[in-house]
Swiss-Prot record:
GO molecular function terms attached to this record: actin binding; G protein-coupled glutamate receptor binding; synaptic receptor adaptor activity
Keywords tagged on the record: Cell membrane, Cell projection, Coiled coil, Cytoplasm, Deafness, Disease variant, Hearing, Membrane, Non-syndromic deafness, Synapse
The gene coding this protein: HOMER2
Name recorded for this polypeptide: Homer protein homolog 2
Role played: Postsynaptic density scaffolding protein. Binds and cross-links cytoplasmic regions of GRM1, GRM5, ITPR1, DNM3, RYR1, RYR2, SHANK1 and SHANK3. By physically linking GRM1 and GRM5 with ER-associated ITPR1 receptors, it aids the coupling of surface receptors to intracellular calcium release. May also couple GRM1 to PI3 kinase through its interaction with AGAP2. Isoforms can be differently regulated and may play an important role in maintaining the plasticity at glutamatergic synapses. Required for normal hearing. Negatively regulates T cell activation by inhibiting the calcineurin-NFAT pathway.
PANTHER family (UniProt xref): HOMER
Main location: cytoplasm
Subunit annotation: Forms coiled-coil structures that mediate homo- and heteromultimerization. Interacts with NFATC2; interaction is reduced by AKT activation. Interacts with NFATC1 and NFATC4. Interacts with DAGLA (via PPXXF motif); this interaction is required for the cell membrane localization of DAGLA.
Length: 354
Protein backbone atom coordinates (compact mmCIF):
# COMPACT_ATOMS: atom_id res chain seq x y z
CA UNK A 1 0.00 0.00 0.00
CA UNK A 2 3.01 2.33 0.42
CA UNK A 3 1.79 3.57 3.80
CA UNK A 4 3.60 3.27 7.12
CA UNK A 5 1.92 1.00 9.70
CA UNK A 6 0.10 2.71 12.58
CA UNK A 7 0.79 -0.14 14.98
CA UNK A 8 2.70 -3.42 14.62
CA UNK A 9 2.88 -6.55 16.75
CA UNK A 10 3.55 -10.29 16.37
CA UNK A 11 1.02 -13.08 16.87
CA UNK A 12 -0.08 -16.50 15.66
CA UNK A 13 -2.94 -16.08 13.13
CA UNK A 14 -6.00 -18.35 13.02
CA UNK A 15 -9.22 -18.46 10.95
CA UNK A 16 -12.50 -20.12 11.83
CA UNK A 17 -13.22 -23.35 9.97
CA UNK A 18 -15.69 -22.32 7.19
CA UNK A 19 -17.35 -25.74 7.25
CA UNK A 20 -17.88 -26.36 10.96
CA UNK A 21 -17.75 -22.71 12.17
CA UNK A 22 -16.40 -24.17 15.41
CA UNK A 23 -12.76 -25.11 15.12
CA UNK A 24 -9.80 -22.79 14.56
CA UNK A 25 -7.46 -23.40 11.65
CA UNK A 26 -3.90 -22.00 11.86
CA UNK A 27 -3.19 -19.52 9.08
CA UNK A 28 0.51 -19.23 9.98
CA UNK A 29 3.03 -21.84 11.08
CA UNK A 30 4.67 -19.39 13.48
CA UNK A 31 4.19 -15.90 14.89
CA UNK A 32 3.98 -13.30 12.09
CA UNK A 33 3.79 -9.52 11.92
CA UNK A 34 0.27 -8.06 12.26
CA UNK A 35 -0.11 -4.32 11.50
CA UNK A 36 -2.74 -1.57 11.36
CA UNK A 37 -2.66 0.54 8.16
CA UNK A 38 -4.54 3.64 6.97
CA UNK A 39 -5.61 3.43 3.30
CA UNK A 40 -5.56 7.04 2.05
CA UNK A 41 -7.17 6.28 -1.32
CA UNK A 42 -10.20 4.59 0.26
CA UNK A 43 -10.15 6.58 3.51
CA UNK A 44 -10.29 3.35 5.51
CA UNK A 45 -8.33 1.41 8.11
CA UNK A 46 -7.09 -2.15 7.60
CA UNK A 47 -5.44 -4.97 9.53
CA UNK A 48 -2.87 -6.65 7.31
CA UNK A 49 -0.59 -9.62 7.95
CA UNK A 50 1.73 -11.29 5.45
CA UNK A 51 3.42 -14.68 5.87
CA UNK A 52 6.21 -14.71 3.27
CA UNK A 53 4.48 -13.91 -0.03
CA UNK A 54 1.02 -14.91 1.24
CA UNK A 55 -1.46 -12.35 2.59
CA UNK A 56 -3.24 -14.10 5.47
CA UNK A 57 -5.12 -11.05 6.84
CA UNK A 58 -6.55 -8.13 4.82
CA UNK A 59 -9.43 -6.97 6.98
CA UNK A 60 -11.09 -3.55 6.60
CA UNK A 61 -12.16 -2.20 9.99
CA UNK A 62 -15.74 -0.93 10.19
CA UNK A 63 -17.47 0.87 13.09
CA UNK A 64 -19.67 -2.15 13.86
CA UNK A 65 -16.73 -4.54 14.34
CA UNK A 66 -15.84 -5.79 17.83
CA UNK A 67 -12.60 -7.32 19.06
CA UNK A 68 -13.28 -9.91 21.78
CA UNK A 69 -10.79 -11.31 24.28
CA UNK A 70 -11.56 -15.00 24.70
CA UNK A 71 -8.62 -15.79 27.01
CA UNK A 72 -5.60 -14.12 28.55
CA UNK A 73 -3.57 -14.39 25.33
CA UNK A 74 -6.17 -14.88 22.56
CA UNK A 75 -8.59 -12.51 20.85
CA UNK A 76 -10.87 -12.57 17.77
CA UNK A 77 -13.01 -10.41 15.51
CA UNK A 78 -15.52 -11.12 12.73
CA UNK A 79 -15.02 -9.69 9.22
CA UNK A 80 -18.35 -9.68 7.36
CA UNK A 81 -16.77 -8.72 4.03
CA UNK A 82 -14.29 -11.58 4.17
CA UNK A 83 -17.05 -13.80 5.61
CA UNK A 84 -14.74 -15.21 8.27
CA UNK A 85 -13.58 -14.81 11.85
CA UNK A 86 -9.92 -14.06 12.56
CA UNK A 87 -8.15 -15.13 15.74
CA UNK A 88 -4.80 -13.95 17.13
CA UNK A 89 -2.70 -15.77 19.71
CA UNK A 90 -0.19 -13.55 21.54
CA UNK A 91 2.82 -14.46 23.65
CA UNK A 92 1.66 -12.29 26.58
CA UNK A 93 -1.48 -10.70 27.97
CA UNK A 94 0.12 -7.26 27.66
CA UNK A 95 0.45 -7.59 23.86
CA UNK A 96 -3.19 -8.69 23.62
CA UNK A 97 -4.32 -5.69 25.68
CA UNK A 98 -2.34 -3.24 23.49
CA UNK A 99 -3.79 -4.77 20.30
CA UNK A 100 -7.35 -4.55 21.69
CA UNK A 101 -6.86 -0.91 22.72
CA UNK A 102 -5.50 -0.03 19.27
CA UNK A 103 -8.44 -1.88 17.64
CA UNK A 104 -10.87 0.32 19.61
CA UNK A 105 -8.97 3.49 18.61
CA UNK A 106 -8.92 2.52 14.92
CA UNK A 107 -12.61 1.58 15.03
CA UNK A 108 -13.47 5.04 16.38
CA UNK A 109 -11.30 6.63 13.66
CA UNK A 110 -13.06 4.51 11.01
CA UNK A 111 -16.42 5.69 12.34
CA UNK A 112 -15.33 9.33 12.12
CA UNK A 113 -14.01 8.78 8.56
CA UNK A 114 -17.28 7.13 7.54
CA UNK A 115 -19.33 10.00 8.99
CA UNK A 116 -17.24 12.55 7.09
CA UNK A 117 -17.61 10.59 3.84
CA UNK A 118 -21.38 10.38 4.37
CA UNK A 119 -21.56 14.14 4.96
CA UNK A 120 -19.66 14.79 1.73
CA UNK A 121 -22.00 12.50 -0.22
CA UNK A 122 -25.11 14.13 1.24
CA UNK A 123 -23.72 17.61 0.53
CA UNK A 124 -22.90 16.66 -3.07
CA UNK A 125 -26.37 15.13 -3.57
CA UNK A 126 -28.15 18.18 -2.14
CA UNK A 127 -26.08 20.51 -4.29
CA UNK A 128 -26.96 18.51 -7.42
CA UNK A 129 -30.67 18.58 -6.61
CA UNK A 130 -30.65 22.34 -5.94
CA UNK A 131 -28.81 23.00 -9.19
CA UNK A 132 -31.38 20.90 -11.06
CA UNK A 133 -34.26 22.84 -9.56
CA UNK A 134 -32.76 26.29 -10.15
CA UNK A 135 -31.93 25.87 -13.85
CA UNK A 136 -35.52 25.81 -15.29
CA UNK A 137 -36.68 28.70 -13.11
CA UNK A 138 -33.83 30.91 -14.18
CA UNK A 139 -34.54 30.10 -17.80
CA UNK A 140 -38.18 30.86 -17.33
CA UNK A 141 -37.43 34.11 -15.57
CA UNK A 142 -35.19 35.26 -18.37
CA UNK A 143 -37.81 34.44 -20.96
CA UNK A 144 -40.57 36.26 -19.10
CA UNK A 145 -38.73 39.34 -17.96
CA UNK A 146 -36.55 39.89 -21.01
CA UNK A 147 -37.58 41.66 -24.22
CA UNK A 148 -37.03 40.35 -27.70
CA UNK A 149 -33.89 42.46 -28.06
CA UNK A 150 -32.50 41.21 -24.78
CA UNK A 151 -33.24 37.61 -25.83
CA UNK A 152 -31.34 38.15 -29.00
CA UNK A 153 -28.36 39.71 -27.21
CA UNK A 154 -28.10 37.15 -24.33
CA UNK A 155 -29.21 33.91 -26.01
CA UNK A 156 -25.73 32.76 -27.07
CA UNK A 157 -23.81 32.99 -23.72
CA UNK A 158 -26.79 31.77 -21.68
CA UNK A 159 -27.21 28.65 -23.79
CA UNK A 160 -23.51 27.88 -23.53
CA UNK A 161 -23.55 28.31 -19.75
CA UNK A 162 -26.69 26.18 -19.43
CA UNK A 163 -25.19 23.42 -21.55
CA UNK A 164 -22.07 23.43 -19.40
CA UNK A 165 -24.12 23.28 -16.20
CA UNK A 166 -26.32 20.54 -17.65
CA UNK A 167 -23.27 18.49 -18.62
CA UNK A 168 -21.87 18.86 -15.10
CA UNK A 169 -25.21 17.87 -13.60
CA UNK A 170 -25.48 14.86 -15.90
CA UNK A 171 -21.99 13.71 -14.87
CA UNK A 172 -22.79 14.27 -11.18
CA UNK A 173 -26.11 12.44 -11.50
CA UNK A 174 -24.42 9.58 -13.35
CA UNK A 175 -21.76 9.33 -10.66
CA UNK A 176 -24.39 9.56 -7.92
CA UNK A 177 -26.47 6.84 -9.57
CA UNK A 178 -23.38 4.66 -9.94
CA UNK A 179 -22.44 5.31 -6.31
CA UNK A 180 -25.99 4.54 -5.17
CA UNK A 181 -25.95 1.30 -7.15
CA UNK A 182 -22.55 0.46 -5.72
CA UNK A 183 -23.74 1.22 -2.17
CA UNK A 184 -26.88 -0.84 -2.71
CA UNK A 185 -24.76 -3.80 -3.86
CA UNK A 186 -22.35 -3.31 -0.95
CA UNK A 187 -25.29 -2.98 1.45
CA UNK A 188 -26.81 -6.19 0.09
CA UNK A 189 -23.42 -7.88 0.43
CA UNK A 190 -23.16 -6.64 4.00
CA UNK A 191 -26.67 -7.89 4.76
CA UNK A 192 -25.86 -11.31 3.33
CA UNK A 193 -22.56 -11.39 5.23
CA UNK A 194 -24.33 -10.29 8.40
CA UNK A 195 -26.88 -13.05 7.90
CA UNK A 196 -24.11 -15.61 7.42
CA UNK A 197 -22.25 -14.24 10.43
CA UNK A 198 -25.44 -14.30 12.49
CA UNK A 199 -25.93 -17.94 11.52
CA UNK A 200 -22.30 -18.64 12.33
CA UNK A 201 -22.62 -16.84 15.67
CA UNK A 202 -25.78 -18.81 16.47
CA UNK A 203 -23.99 -22.02 15.57
CA UNK A 204 -21.02 -20.85 17.64
CA UNK A 205 -23.38 -20.10 20.54
CA UNK A 206 -24.87 -23.58 20.21
CA UNK A 207 -21.37 -24.98 20.05
CA UNK A 208 -20.45 -22.96 23.13
CA UNK A 209 -23.41 -24.40 24.99
CA UNK A 210 -22.38 -27.87 23.87
CA UNK A 211 -18.80 -27.14 24.93
CA UNK A 212 -20.10 -25.88 28.28
CA UNK A 213 -22.04 -29.11 28.78
CA UNK A 214 -19.02 -31.16 27.75
CA UNK A 215 -16.85 -29.02 30.01
CA UNK A 216 -19.25 -29.56 32.90
CA UNK A 217 -19.20 -33.32 32.26
CA UNK A 218 -15.41 -33.29 32.01
CA UNK A 219 -15.17 -31.18 35.15
CA UNK A 220 -17.40 -33.62 37.06
CA UNK A 221 -15.35 -36.51 35.73
CA UNK A 222 -12.19 -34.62 36.66
CA UNK A 223 -13.51 -34.05 40.20
CA UNK A 224 -14.39 -37.74 40.48
CA UNK A 225 -10.94 -38.74 39.26
CA UNK A 226 -9.33 -36.29 41.65
CA UNK A 227 -11.31 -37.76 44.55
CA UNK A 228 -10.27 -41.23 43.40
CA UNK A 229 -6.66 -40.08 43.17
CA UNK A 230 -6.92 -38.60 46.68
CA UNK A 231 -8.29 -41.92 47.97
CA UNK A 232 -5.51 -43.84 46.24
CA UNK A 233 -2.92 -41.41 47.56
CA UNK A 234 -4.35 -41.86 51.06
CA UNK A 235 -4.18 -45.63 50.63
CA UNK A 236 -0.63 -45.31 49.34
CA UNK A 237 0.19 -43.16 52.36
CA UNK A 238 -1.22 -45.82 54.69
CA UNK A 239 0.75 -48.51 52.84
CA UNK A 240 3.88 -46.39 53.08
CA UNK A 241 3.27 -45.87 56.80
CA UNK A 242 2.83 -49.62 57.28
CA UNK A 243 6.01 -50.24 55.29
CA UNK A 244 7.82 -47.72 57.43
CA UNK A 245 6.51 -49.42 60.59
CA UNK A 246 7.62 -52.81 59.25
CA UNK A 247 11.03 -51.37 58.44
CA UNK A 248 11.30 -49.95 61.95
CA UNK A 249 10.23 -53.30 63.45
CA UNK A 250 12.79 -55.16 61.33
CA UNK A 251 15.45 -52.70 62.41
CA UNK A 252 14.41 -53.15 66.07
CA UNK A 253 14.49 -56.95 65.70
CA UNK A 254 17.99 -56.75 64.21
CA UNK A 255 19.09 -54.52 67.09
CA UNK A 256 17.62 -56.94 69.64
CA UNK A 257 19.28 -59.88 67.91
CA UNK A 258 22.60 -58.02 67.99
CA UNK A 259 22.10 -57.27 71.71
CA UNK A 260 21.23 -60.93 72.31
CA UNK A 261 24.42 -62.02 70.56
CA UNK A 262 26.41 -59.58 72.68
CA UNK A 263 24.76 -60.91 75.87
CA UNK A 264 25.53 -64.48 74.82
CA UNK A 265 29.15 -63.50 74.21
CA UNK A 266 29.30 -61.84 77.63
CA UNK A 267 27.73 -64.94 79.21
CA UNK A 268 30.37 -67.15 77.59
CA UNK A 269 33.08 -64.82 78.87
CA UNK A 270 31.57 -64.94 82.37
CA UNK A 271 31.44 -68.72 82.24
CA UNK A 272 35.10 -68.83 81.23
CA UNK A 273 35.91 -66.40 84.02
CA UNK A 274 33.95 -68.51 86.53
CA UNK A 275 36.19 -71.45 85.68
CA UNK A 276 39.32 -69.53 86.74
CA UNK A 277 37.76 -68.02 89.87
CA UNK A 278 39.35 -70.62 92.28
CA UNK A 279 42.76 -69.91 90.82
CA UNK A 280 42.11 -66.22 91.14
CA UNK A 281 41.02 -66.72 94.77
CA UNK A 282 44.27 -68.50 95.64
CA UNK A 283 46.28 -65.84 93.86
CA UNK A 284 44.28 -63.22 95.73
CA UNK A 285 45.12 -64.88 99.10
CA UNK A 286 48.80 -65.06 98.16
CA UNK A 287 48.76 -61.40 97.17
CA UNK A 288 46.97 -60.52 100.43
CA UNK A 289 49.67 -62.27 102.47
CA UNK A 290 52.36 -60.43 100.55
CA UNK A 291 50.47 -57.19 101.10
CA UNK A 292 50.29 -57.81 104.85
CA UNK A 293 54.02 -58.59 104.97
CA UNK A 294 54.73 -55.44 103.00
CA UNK A 295 52.57 -53.46 105.39
CA UNK A 296 54.52 -54.87 108.35
CA UNK A 297 57.81 -54.00 106.67
CA UNK A 298 56.44 -50.57 105.95
CA UNK A 299 55.49 -50.14 109.60
CA UNK A 300 58.99 -51.13 110.69
CA UNK A 301 60.47 -48.71 108.23
CA UNK A 302 58.21 -45.95 109.49
CA UNK A 303 59.36 -46.68 113.09
CA UNK A 304 62.98 -46.51 111.94
CA UNK A 305 62.28 -43.24 110.16
CA UNK A 306 60.74 -41.75 113.27
CA UNK A 307 63.75 -42.91 115.34
CA UNK A 308 66.13 -41.38 112.81
CA UNK A 309 64.17 -38.14 112.89
CA UNK A 310 64.49 -38.10 116.70
CA UNK A 311 68.24 -38.71 116.46
CA UNK A 312 68.53 -35.93 113.90
CA UNK A 313 66.68 -33.53 116.17
CA UNK A 314 68.93 -34.44 119.08
CA UNK A 315 72.02 -34.03 116.89
CA UNK A 316 70.80 -30.61 115.76
CA UNK A 317 70.23 -29.63 119.38
CA UNK A 318 73.73 -30.73 120.36
CA UNK A 319 75.19 -28.84 117.42
CA UNK A 320 73.42 -25.66 118.46
CA UNK A 321 74.65 -26.15 122.05
CA UNK A 322 78.21 -26.73 120.82
CA UNK A 323 78.04 -23.61 118.67
CA UNK A 324 77.03 -21.57 121.73
CA UNK A 325 79.84 -23.04 123.81
CA UNK A 326 82.32 -22.54 120.96
CA UNK A 327 81.27 -18.94 120.63
CA UNK A 328 81.77 -18.36 124.37
CA UNK A 329 85.17 -20.04 124.22
CA UNK A 330 86.22 -17.90 121.28
CA UNK A 331 85.16 -14.78 123.10
CA UNK A 332 87.22 -15.84 126.16
CA UNK A 333 90.13 -16.71 123.87
CA UNK A 334 89.96 -13.32 122.22
CA UNK A 335 90.11 -11.71 125.65
CA UNK A 336 93.12 -13.81 126.60
CA UNK A 337 94.88 -12.90 123.38
CA UNK A 338 94.21 -9.23 123.99
CA UNK A 339 95.65 -9.61 127.53
CA UNK A 340 98.69 -11.35 126.09
CA UNK A 341 99.29 -8.51 123.64
CA UNK A 342 99.01 -6.02 126.44
CA UNK A 343 101.51 -8.06 128.48
CA UNK A 344 103.96 -8.11 125.53
CA UNK A 345 103.73 -4.43 125.02
CA UNK A 346 104.41 -3.99 128.77
CA UNK A 347 107.49 -6.23 128.57
CA UNK A 348 108.74 -4.40 125.53
CA UNK A 349 108.32 -1.12 127.27
CA UNK A 350 110.25 -2.35 130.34
CA UNK A 351 113.11 -3.57 128.14
CA UNK A 352 113.32 -0.22 126.47
CA UNK A 353 113.44 1.66 129.73
CA UNK A 354 116.38 -0.44 131.04
Amino acid sequence: MGEQPIFTTRAHVFQIDPNTKKNWMPASKQAVTVSYFYDVTRNSYRIISVDGAKVIINSTITPNMTFTKTSQKFGQWADSRANTVFGLGFSSEQQLTKFAEKFQEVKEAAKIAKDKTQEKIETSSNHSQESGRETPSSTQASSVNGTDDEKASHAGPANTHLKSENDKLKIALTQSAANVKKWEIELQTLRESNARLTTALQESAASVEQWKRQFSICRDENDRLRNKIDELEEQCSEINREKEKNTQLKRRIEELEAELREKETELKDLRKQSEIIPQLMSECEYVSEKLEAAERDNQNLEDKVRSLKTDIEESKYRQRHLKVELKSFLEVLDGKIDDLHDFRRGLSKLGTDN
